[in-house]
Amino acid sequence: FLMAELKITAANFENEVLRSDKPVLLDFYADWCGPCKMLAPVLHEIAEESTGAFKVGKINVDEQMELAMRFQVSSIPMLVVFKDGKAVAKSVGYRPKSEIAAMVEGAR
C-alpha cells in the first residue's frame, strides 16, 4: 500500500511545503473526525491523479498541535493550498472532488 499523500510534521513542513517547487494541498485532519474520513479517499484520488504536478500532504492535528495552532485550525477537515511558501487558498469542511481540484488548479 503506497501512500500518494505525504505525512507532514513540524520536522518536514519547511522542506516539503514551504520550500516545495510545486503547489502543495494540505489536509488538516484527525482520526476521530467523520468528515475527514469521508474526505480521505477523495484526497487519495486527487493525489494519485496529480501526476506530479502538485503534492498532497496530510497533517494530523492531534499529533501536530504546533502546526494546527500556527494555521489557526479551528475546524476540520481544513484544506490549505500552498504555493511558493504561502497559503493561497483555504477551505473548511467536506468538499467534493471538483471543488478541491479547482482550488488546486487555481494555484498552478
Language-model segment annotations:
Residues 75-108:
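Non-catalytic, surface beta->alpha helical segment in thiol-disulfide oxidoreductase systems
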Residues 1-2:
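Short, Lys/Arg-enriched N-terminal segments with co-localized hydrophobic residues
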